Amino acid sequence: MKSLKLKLIIFILANSWIGVAQQLPQFTQYMYNTISINPAYAGSRETLSGVGLHRSQWVGIEGAPTTQTLSIHTPLRNDRIGVGVSFINDELGYENFSYLYGDFSYTIPMGEKAKLAFGIKGGFTQYHIDQTILNDPTVVNDQFFDDVSNRWSPNVGLGLYLHTNKWYVGLSAPRVLNTDYNNGGNGTIDYVALERISYYATGGYVFDLSETTKFKPAVLLKATNGAPLSFDMTANFLFNDKFWLGGSYRINESAAALGFITDLQVSKQLRIGYAYEYPLSELNTYTSGTHEVILMFEVFKSKRIKSPRFF
């Protein structure tokens, strides 16, 4: 019973700042997982690319969010078309969202260096709530948990991605349709499971500080109807094109955090990374922080790639 109550508390607390708007999960290493929020990114690395990520948020709090993502994308032979597929599994207490989406992009050259890509994303979102909480006698009659169910719902997303080898700017809405996951959706309950449209703006630049050192700042702005505005800033240094070291800061009404990021280019095809976040809210009394690991791989089939890809 104690375990149930702890999970129930984190479930309610987390959704109190989400409000009625279910958001896509947030990532410290968002700049390396762009395909999950912007379909126009598909194929931009000019080779077959994959990203796997695991995030354990607010470690030490039972029922805190955990997220896994897996994505693969590649350009087609004519270079202008990119395709990909992405999967996200996001669990929060007794609540689980799974996203399975395909990505398509079309790229237009903008001069000698810049490229502008248009993207569309389509697929399904599954909403699931653990029956354990619904069957427990202490909450079975609580209207807070009425009208929730397991269901699959279709959705689509759109994106723009303007980039060169030195900088990028992106705009996207990975879920365009507002989805009600409650049975009936009659508005008679205090909590409703709704997936609201989120808007993302991203950007980054690579500065050459010396022959062996590069500096890459990046930003992400996320706006969701019914949820606090979120702004992420990161600053990474790259040494000898092998080792990344940097930090991050998230400005958010309820989930501000300070982070540390490190990555290692193990080989031309393989890169691994780790990020740690410390919450700058009252949550830091109950958690040791957030941990995130990422694995990136690429299969080089083309002799056309002439410079390293920094994002």
Regions found by a protein language model. Give the residues of each.
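Positively charged n-region of N-terminal signal peptides that target proteins for export
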Residues: M1-K7, M110-E112
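Active-site glycine/GP-rich loop and adjacent strand/helix microenvironment
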Residues: G19
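Subset of outer-membrane beta-barrel
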Residues: Q22-F311
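Sec-dependent N-terminal signal peptides
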Residues: L4-S16
